[in-house]
Amino acid sequence: MDALFMPQFHPARDIHDVYFVKEPTHARSIAEPYLTRVVQAHEKGTGAGSTGWGYQFDVERAKRLVLRSQGTAVSARALAGGASVPGKYFSIARCFRYDQVDATHATDFFQVEGIVLGADINFRTLLGLLNLFAREVAQAKEVKFLPAYFPFTEPSVEMHVRHPKLGWMELGGAGLFRPEVTTPLGVSVPVIAWGLGLDRMAMVALGIHDIRDLFSADLDFVRTMRGNF
């Protein structure tokens, strides 16, 4: 989350800094020059009007090993690895959060993560791709977008689709990476990013009313699932 320009003591990190690895507890090192650049972004900003968060970055805290809480961490690693421009990168990431288990939430789930970068990329490009995912993958009939806030994107948006029984349901969040994210990773062109709940997309596509049923051991139930996903 440090590479995503989320302050180390920000309340938004409460759902991310939860599942800590017991052994080893810390990474041996963090690759340079990315560590120095990320520290600079947090403490003083990246220039061009960016002032950072104005606190002293704790490198030892950054080395703590935690289970991934969202797939955007994979996107940051892809950018740091020397992403091509223009380029498109996608992944399916298993994530872990301390959520109250109910019909639409689980403590571990899968996210479809994507980034697209290029000189001509903009917010309209992002909305078009999100709409395509919702209609072609989740097979949603109704889609809507709502303004959102994430520390690492600006502007940001949430995508919701209508489930036949549960009503409007959030599929995930998206936005344009802030310069404080892309500059330390060596990227100078716009980058759009999104993380969508694959399990929830399957719920809509398969007509399932409870996310726990996706992992049911009831073979009769599995055989009666409609369609393919």
Q: What residues fall within each predicted segment?
A:
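TRNA-recognition modules of translation machinery and tRNA-sensing kinases, especially anticodon-binding
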Residues: M1-F229
